[in-house]
Amino acid sequence: LYDPEKSVHYLNLASTVAGLEDAIPVTSQLYELLKQQNIQLPVLADLRKLPYTKATEIYEYMYDQYWKKCTHRLLISLPPQRGFVRDLAVASGAAIVWLDARDWKENTVLRKFMKTMQPGESIITGWYAEERSGIGLATEYGLSTIPSDFYENTTVYAGMQQQIQYPEIPKMPALENKIYLALYMSDGDNVQYCQHAMSELWDKKGRGVIPINWTISPGLVDFGPGLLNHYYTTATPNDFFASGPSGMGYSLIYDAHNYLWNATSGTDFTPYAKLTQQYLEKSGLRVITIWDEVNQEQMGAYVRNCRYLYGLTQQDWERRPYKVPTYIQDHKLAFVPNLPCYANGVDVIYSFWRDTIAKFDGSHPIFLSAQGESWKMGPDNIVALKKRLEELSPGNIVICRGDHFFNLHNQANYLPFNLTLLPKMKITSSPTSTETKFAAD
């Protein structure tokens, strides 16, 4: 029993207790209605007796009395008034909190929960009062976040047991002295975007005409394998999927807006990189988009622990005194800047690329990458963008899938690349139960 009039945060406490006690959270009014219908249920916890009115007090009480009983593999960050993803918390015995990392008192309580979770095993789901402060605080403790505060029917989608049906990998084009461009659609780390807005973009005219790189959450392997299979089985050869930032769950290693490193050590970053590799294997994803940047120690952690990767992009928000360069880590793995990195339309991408493309002299291949804000662009806009770019350098524009982009980049720079993707490469094998076409991946 709880009283939302005393504080709405009692609903989160009641939901948490309900998950642990196999009970239901009920207000006084609803309790009376149940009794009127002769539904006599025992009261396992009467939270109305508690004297607390502040969020910090209520979640301190939750931490002291119930956190040790909760699973520490999952923490739900969710406004009390919101029902989405709450079913997952109750089903899994997870705690539900709503604390603002910008408020130092609430920040202190939130840290109590996070510091007792396990990097590389635990994740946070839901969302935060403010993006960068919340994601940044979780990153500080080696934790990543699956944005899901509007994800519907979580336990239904997560309860599906499905073998992931990986899309076939087409051959990449032959390397020439041309302009290779990769265009990424943002926000795929957000599983409710994958459930709703992405499906609307997916059905728009123009998809499949030219290569588009769709960011998607590797966490859908657990959160919604049916959703992942929907996109994989309806994809064209021009649809490529990349992991949203910055691997298994949203992690903000360097916050370029606030000039703040939330994590600096490659060693501390390793559990996240190892967790990411597990989900790259399960989801079949081989490119990651990073928000915002990582240092070279952390690049090394990706190289050592994420052996499936072809490459990664970083976000150049132009908040440095220099442009973010392309890094090649350990003579193997490329970290390429997205510039622009969160364009609010194709006109922005065109303006960033125009001069470089217009000055192209054909002496060697060049590689440019950009990420567009999914809410403000779609396949039809990208098709129109290609036509405009071709006018700047006729016959030289090659828009690429992400896997092709990084393999062509490595081939051009005499770095390791996947030979099976070469257009004239033929793959044969001795008798096997696996089709040889899968050797390309």
Q: Model-derived features: where do they sit?
A:
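Active-site beta->alpha N-cap acidic-glycine motif
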Residues: E152-Y232
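Short, solvent-exposed loop/linker segments at the N-terminal edge
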Residues: S429-A440
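Substrate-binding cleft of extracellular glycoside hydrolase catalytic domains
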Residues: S217-Q278, K282-L285
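A structural signal for short, well-ordered beta-strand segments and their strand-loop junctions
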Residues: S122-W127, T215, A242-G244, T289-W291, ...
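Preference for solvent-exposed, low-hydrophobicity sequence contexts
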Residues: L1-A158
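Catalytic grooves of carbohydrate-active enzymes
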Residues: M117, S186-V209, G219, S283-L422
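Acidic (Asp/Glu)-rich catalytic clusters
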Residues: P173-L175, E200-R207, F223-S246, L280, ...
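A recurrent domain-boundary module in secreted/ectodomain proteins
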Residues: T145-P167, G402-K426
